[in-house]
Amino acid sequence: MSERKLFTSESVSEGHPDKIADQISDAILDAILAEDPEAHVAAETCVYTGSVHVFGEISTTAYIDINRVVRDTIAEIGYTEAEYGFSAESVGVHPSLVEQSGDIAQGVNEAFESREGDTDDLSHIGAGDQGLMFGFAINETPELMPLPISLSHQLVRRLAELRKSGEISYLRPDAKSQVTVEYDEHDKPVRVDTVVISTQHDPEATNDQIRQDVIEKVIKAVIPADYLDDDTKFFINPTGRFVIGGPQGDSGLTGRKIIVDTYGGYSRHGGGAFSGKDATKVDRSASYAARYIAKNLVAAGLVTKAEVQLAYAIGVAQPVSVRVDTFGTSTVPEAVLEAAVRQVFDLRPAGIIQMLDLKRPIYKQTAAYGHMGRTDIDLPWERLNKVDALVEAVKTVL
């Protein structure tokens, strides 16, 4: 009997409470960066019934209307009705942002290397904290992402499209998806075993209507027919009712969907969240750099699967470690790939910021439906412009 394995990933919609918080935090970051690209920002958000709290630390010359940014973000998501228990115009907004700690700022503004006499401009900025970050790529999908998280994101995005277009008028903003994919003995995806979708809805909508619409207009529109069969299981709103949702149903907090934001659990995660953080925070920028490296390694044909780990010390520019794990799929030794990566990519925080142009207000668009593998928006860490350089670097190392 051939060995078959199941792997499951989930996603959540832009109307999920934790994702509302992420989007508000990144909307604030973008608003600040639009006026002050040199700003340091760590903006956290908590949402619950009728209330939004924004707190954290910033260093900036910009002035922004946080109240307006919060309300506009909530309205764009779709919380515009008082009956939702959380609406853009009636919600209470409570900002509490303070100046960044001077002890942290001194290590970011002047890295250890700079204090030791390194005059290179890209050695001037130190990592905003210690930590480890992972990036991943695999040849399962055109965007080089694991199939379970790719499908999960597409399902909740499709729900949002149908809601906003009015094609399914009873949908409300909160939703979740989960996809279980079956893999063969060679770790190739062969079918979708289970799909779970929970979507908030108006009280008048019936379970039969919701089930039919979700299967026909969402699942079958997203998942290729080759992956679906008579044994594929669909669980649509399995509790039987999902009228109360969003922050009225559950509180939400920035940074609580880090697996949804990345690879759906298919790859390791260093633990640091992204939203609300400027690019001097390596939790965010180095995770993007690691994805950039992994994706270009796979696209170059050097590997079929790659996980890249980067690690940093606070106030130090150079990473303390760079590791490439290819799970036995590399055409050359992993040590060669690591040396090539160090040749091609400048992994100091300032190097990453320059390489990926990260001082721009580009972050709010990443705060729902994943930071990695996006095909609907142009993200610099998703570009395949280092393929040739990596191939040449491998040759020089060998």
From Swiss-Prot:
Keywords: ATP-binding, Cytoplasm, Magnesium, Metal-binding, Nucleotide-binding, One-carbon metabolism, Potassium, Transferase. It comes from Streptococcus pyogenes serotype M1. Gene3D superfamilies: 3.30.300.10. This is S-adenosylmethionine synthase. It is found in: Cytoplasm. K(+) binds at E44. It holds the Pfam family S-AdoMet_synt_M. GO terms for biological process: one-carbon metabolic process; S-adenosylmethionine biosynthetic process.
